[in-house]
């Protein structure tokens, strides 16, 4: 019988419920149990696709084309698995289904209500995924007490009643602040948060107490007493240097063992050796390289979370720590490329719209002319084509029709199948598509195979009418779409140290033990470039 672990959050948002949920999933998987993670987002949006990265962070793209919350990226990285769009349950999806059923007459004239109809649909979606797994970790987004979360918490309460207490556990993530004035950790916010949860009929089985420093014994005892949670199940999750340390911290605190016992499962020795090795290696890195990320959402770095993580993975594989220099593309427009001086590598990531586009083009020109290791992603790939057209081929005013519909040289154009769409949500070229790689190229040396599947999220593409002109001028298109060879996927400049751009998002498939090849290559090239600079100085 499938076991369920619900993870809720209290006091404030942004405590790291996603990392806690991913860590619990890893601890269960490390014990040999078939485990998956589900994220519940209580917003009314159907998916994360049309959300502003400033508000919500990055939109993570799955193999099946699902545009989902960034927490699913953490789940995939921690559990080394590929999830589906169904693993992200939103209020929008739930209500859509219920309203469709009502319109079809499936409720036989009943008054459709939150209980039972909405809660039944939530439970149905969770159970549908659970069929194939021993353990399902379900993170309920938001904070206990939010009006949006109520139906989901009620559905979770009902599931414990229906599945049996030994099959459903609740983990509550809270915040324990330390007031500088008195110098002690305060448990009152946690007490109130649990009180709120209990008023909804849910008694947490374990409490993950987030704090700056390790939880003091006095605070632990107090939380246990006032929340009716055993002392061994009050877990100290203090701030660590890197999120990949969290599973090891929770395991040391005994959370994995406690949940296994609570769910009446056989406790097995967790195999975390590879994970421990990876964390130790990352922490021990001394040598550094600095890589600039020039984007339009850099004020909220979570907008580029998967890129940050992919650089971390490539740090471990190259024995060098990456320091990121965050640069707003508009600042390049205003202050020039001097903001890039001294960097060992440059990334121009994805993004939509005109704001900052010229700054990104200036950045690409700087990388190309100064032979600095460079990686362009999605919009960064398209703007690399624009920069090359303008500054190498002399096509004055060349642009993407996304930015300038009247450009004399539309070197990047809307894909034909995108031309008559009325809806924005879920209509891009989304998800994993095959990419054919040409032998004898940088891309082939990185991937070491001729066919790869990478995740996409775009409407525009390189205009096939200009490909011949680009290739004559020395630009190599080393990867094309497996389903349409006129669709360009990877470009490179062979005469440069490392200059590559991809139409797809390689960061979405990067994993701690298997870094994305183009990121591994970028960090390696940045390391070699820095060594060269140091040798000549």
Swiss-Prot record:
Residues 1-265 are annotated as: Amidoligase domain. Its EC number is 6.3.4.2. Homotetramer. It is an enzyme of class 6 (ligase). Allosterically activated by GTP, when glutamine is the substrate; GTP has no effect on the reaction when ammonia is the substrate. The allosteric effector GTP functions by stabilizing the protein conformation that binds the tetrahedral intermediate(s) formed during glutamine hydrolysis. Inhibited by the product CTP, via allosteric rather than competitive inhibition. L-glutamine binds at residues 54, 351, 379-382, 402, 459. CTP binds at residues 13, 146-148, 186-191, 222. Keywords: ATP-binding, Glutamine amidotransferase, Ligase, Magnesium, Metal-binding, Nucleotide-binding, Pyrimidine biosynthesis. It comes from Pyrococcus horikoshii (strain ATCC 700860 / DSM 12428 / JCM 9974 / NBRC 100139 / OT-3). One of its GO terms (biological process) is pyrimidine nucleobase biosynthetic process. InterPro entries: Class_I_gatase-like, CTP_synthase, CTP_synthase_N, GATASE, GATase1_CTP_Synthase, P-loop_NTPase. ATP binds at residues 14-19, 71. The gene is pyrG. Belongs to the CTP synthase family. Mg(2+) binds at residues 71, 139. Residues 290-532 form the Glutamine amidotransferase type-1 domain. HAMAP family: PyrG. This is CTP synthase. Disulfide bonds: none annotated. UTP binds at residues 13, 186-191, 222. CTPSs have evolved a hybrid strategy for distinguishing between UTP and CTP. The overlapping regions of the product feedback inhibitory and substrate sites recognize a common feature in both compounds, the triphosphate moiety. To differentiate isosteric substrate and product pyrimidine rings, an additional pocket far from the expected kinase/ligase catalytic site, specifically recognizes the cytosine and ribose portions of the product inhibitor.
């Amino acid at each position: 019988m499938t076991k369920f672990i619900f993870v809720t959050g209290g006091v404030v948002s942004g405590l790291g419920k996603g990392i806690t949920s991913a860590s619990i999933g890893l601890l269960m998987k490390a014990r040999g149990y078939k485990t998956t993670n589900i994220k519940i987002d209580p917003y009314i949006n159907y998916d994360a696709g049309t959300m502003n990265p400033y508000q919500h962070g990055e939109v993570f793209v799955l193999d099946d084309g699902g545009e989902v919350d960034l927490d699913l990226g953490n789940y995939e990285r921690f559990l080394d698995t590929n999830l589906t769009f169904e693993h992200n349950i939103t209020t929008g999806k739930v209500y859509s289904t219920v309203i469709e059923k009502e319109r079809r007459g499936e409720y036989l004239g009943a008054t459709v209500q939150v209980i039972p109809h909405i809660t039944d649909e939530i439970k149905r979606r969770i159970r549908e995924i659970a069929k194939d797994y021993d353990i399902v970790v379900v993170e309920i987004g938001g904070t206990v007490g939010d009006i949006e979360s109520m139906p989901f918490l009620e559905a979770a309460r009902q599931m414990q009643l229906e599945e049996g207490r030994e099959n459903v556990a609740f983990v509550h993530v809270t915040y324990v602040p330390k007031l500088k004035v008195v110098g002690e950790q305060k448990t009152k916010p946690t007490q109130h948060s649990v009180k709120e949860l209990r008023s909804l009929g849910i008694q947490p089985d374990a409490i993950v107490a987030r704090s700056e420093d390790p939880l003091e014994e006095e605070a632990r005892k107090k939380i246990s007493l006032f929340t009716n949670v055993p002392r061994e199940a009050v877990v100290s999750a203090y701030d660590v240097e890197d999120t990949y340390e969290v599973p090891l911290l929770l395991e040391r605190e005994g959370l994995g063992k406690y949940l296994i016992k609570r769910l009446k499962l056989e406790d097995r020795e967790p195999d975390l050796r590879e994970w421990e090795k990876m964390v130790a290696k990352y922490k021990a890195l001394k040598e550094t390289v600095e890589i600039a990320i020039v984007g339009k959402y850099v004020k909220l770095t979570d907008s580029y979370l998967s890129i940050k993580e992919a650089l971390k993975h490539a740090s471990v594989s190259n024995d060098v720590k990456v320091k990121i220099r965050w640069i707003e593309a508009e600042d390049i427009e205003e202050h020039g490329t001097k903001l890039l001086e001294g960097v060992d590598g440059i990334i121009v990531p994805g993004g939509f719209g005109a704001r900052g586009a010229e700054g990104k083009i200036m950045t690409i020109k700087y990388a190309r002319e100064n032979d600095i290791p460079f990686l362009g992603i999605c919009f960064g790939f398209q703007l690399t084509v624009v920069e090359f057209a303008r500054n190498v081929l002399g096509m004055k005013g060349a642009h993407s029709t996304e930015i300038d519909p009247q450009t004399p040289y539309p070197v990047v154009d809307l894909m034909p199948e995108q031309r008559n769409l009325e809806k924005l949500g879920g209509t891009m070229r989304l998800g994993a598509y095959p990419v054919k790689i040409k032998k004898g190229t940088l891309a082939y040396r990185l991937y070491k195979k001729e066919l790869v599947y990478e995740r996409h999220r775009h409407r525009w593409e390189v205009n096939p009418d200009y490909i011949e002109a680009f290739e004559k001028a020395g630009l190599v298109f080393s990867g094309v779409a497996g389903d349409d060879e006129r669709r360009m996927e990877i470009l490179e400049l062979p005469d440069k140290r490392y200059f590559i751009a991809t139409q797809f998002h390689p960061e979405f498939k990067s994993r701690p033990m298997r870094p994305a090849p183009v990121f591994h290559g970028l960090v390696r090239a940045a390391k070699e470039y820095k060594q060269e600079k140091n040798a000549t100085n």
